[in-house]
A protein has these predicted regions:
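Conserved PLP-anchoring active-site segment centered on the Schiff-base-forming lysine
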Residues: 67-123
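Conserved PLP-binding active-site segment in aminotransferase class I/II-type PLP enzymes
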Residues: 1-77, 98, 150, 273
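Generic structural signal for small/hydrophobic residues in well-ordered secondary structure
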Residues: 21-22, 44, 62, 82, ...
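Active-site phosphate-binding strand-loop segment of PLP-dependent enzymes
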Residues: 111-192, 197-205
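Active-site region of PLP-dependent enzymes
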Residues: 163-169, 176-286
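Hydrophobic/aromatic ligand-binding patch that stacks against planar heteroaromatic rings
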Residues: 94-96, 148, 172, 249
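Aromatic/hydrophobic pocket-lining residues that form π-stacking "cages" and hydrophobic walls in ligand
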Residues: 92, 145, 209
């Protein structure tokens, strides 16, 4: 019997609308940082309620910036600990190691998110942050994790790679964390080719992340071009940074996808409920 495989990880694009958006970038002659990246940052803030939103080239870059900025601004030392989970993509824990910090693995609960008892067992005087991974868009016991961390002065980094559109009691996740990082990679629920958004609660953290993501340069090309008057050739390189900025082509795709995100997530919930219904009566499946 021939069986047609069900492809789980194929991005769904509104092709004509996406091509029109990309064409707008090309006709304007601005495909890099600025223009559409400014638009998607504003739209993302409006959609989620986050205070700051910085469009970057991947969730991985955003996680690295999140940890790098918090380490610099809060005076963390090499070897300080970040409680995390092994049940995640490697980017989550690579970012911890990039910054000379130590990942401490906690177990997961029935929601596949960090288990509270396991978390409490692993908190030490060297714990500086908890990396909460909302795998599959699940929130697990995220609110309890927040409470535990707040009462102990521990930072909360939300790896929200799967959480575009995730809400708790009607409120989008992200604003409550010290920093939340979303993925817009091709197989995520808000697909581009690859990009992401890093969202700091603190304005100074956001400002540092923006400099670091543009090679430590004080003003990006878009600011120097559209700041009034002639192009500004003079700028400072205040610190050693990275090339993590997003671009307008990816932002154009994200702006289109964002318009359909809630509808797409509703369809995912419908399919999930169908699986629950059809598999629920089978012994051994919970």
């Amino acid at each position: 019997m021939n069986r047609t495989p069900i492809q789980l990880f194929v991005p769904h694009f509104r092709i004509d609308e996406s091509l029109d958006a990309v064409r707008t970038c090309m006709e304007r002659g601005w495909t890099g940082l600025g223009f559409m990246t400014v638009d998607i940052e504003q739209k993302w803030k409006e959609y989620t309620g986050v205070k700051n939103a910085h469009f970057v080239n991947s969730n991985t870059a955003g996680l690295h910036l999140a940890l790098d900025v918090l380490k610099r601004r809060r005076g963390w030392a090499d070897g300080d600990e970040v409680i995390t989970t092994a049940l995640t993509f490697v980017s989550t824990n690579h970012a911890i190691l990039y910054c000379g910090l130590t990942p401490v693995f906690a177990d997961v609960d029935e929601y596949l998110c960090i288990d509270l008892a396991s978390l409490l067992e692993r908190i030490t005087d060297k714990t500086r942050a908890v990396m909460f991974v909302g795998i599959g868009g699940n929130v697990g016991r995220y609110l309890e994790v927040l409470e535990i961390c707040r009462s102990r002065g521990i930072a909360v980094i939300l790896d929200a790679a799967h959480m575009a559109g995730t809400r708790i009691d009607g409120h989008h996740v992200g604003p409550e964390a010290d920093v939340a990082v979303f993925s817009f990679q091709a197989v995520k629920n808000l697909p581009t080719a690859d990009s992401g958004m890093v969202c700091f609660a603190d304005d100074a953290d956001d400002a540092l992340a923006r400099r670091l993501s543009w090679l430590g340069i004080s003003k990006d090309t878009y600011e120097r071009t559209h700041g009034g008057g002639a192009y500004k050739w003079m700028y400072d390189v205040d610190e050693l940074g990275y090339k993590y900025n997003g671009n307008s082509i990816m932002a154009a795709l994200a702006l289109v996808a964002l318009k359909y995100l809630d509808d797409d997530n509703a369809e995912r919930r419908r399919i999930s409920a169908l699986y629950d219904s059809l598999l629920g009566g089978i012994d051994g499946i919970e």
